[in-house]
């Protein structure tokens, strides 16, 4: 019984280390979404933190601010979809 417990404890320690490494790598990953043929682009990390937003001045219309809002939402959605796909793949390879 003792050796089985030690083995499980060692496996748990390895899984914990893998999880911590994966979590740290999420901060380094970058996912970009663009909308309006590149008029707006956003970059997020693997924790869905917004890293950068770029807006081309040609899409700034004071008469129609909803355009920029729509483009921002679309770009963010694309970046998040990329992140979600990769996270799903990463989870499928985890042993737990």
From Swiss-Prot:
User: According to its UniProt record, where is this protein mainly located?
Assistant: cytoplasm
Q: Name one Pfam family in it.
A: YbaB_DNA_bd
Q: Which UniProt keywords apply?
A: Cytoplasm, DNA-binding
Q: Which Gene3D superfamilies match?
A: Nucleoid-associated protein YbaB-like domain
Q: Which GO terms describe its molecular function?
A: DNA binding
Does Cytoplasm show up as a keyword for this record? Answer: yes
Where, per UniProt, does this protein localize? Cytoplasm, Nucleoid
Name the domain of life: Bacteria
Gene Ontology CC entries for this record: bacterial nucleoid; cytosol
Mind telling me which InterPro entries this protein's record contains?
A: YbaB-like_sf, YbaB/EbfC
The UniProt record lists the keyword Protein biosynthesis: no
Its assembly, as annotated, is: Homodimer.
PANTHER family for this protein: NUCLEOID-ASSOCIATED PROTEIN YBAB
Question: What's its job?
Answer: Binds to DNA and alters its conformation. May be involved in regulation of gene expression, nucleoid organization and DNA protection.
Question: Record's family?
Answer: Belongs to the YbaB/EbfC family.
The name this protein carries in UniProt is Nucleoid-associated protein CPn_0039/CP_0736/CPj0039/CpB0043
Could you read off the lineage of the organism from its UniProt record? Answer: Bacteria, Pseudomonadati, Chlamydiota, Chlamydiia, Chlamydiales
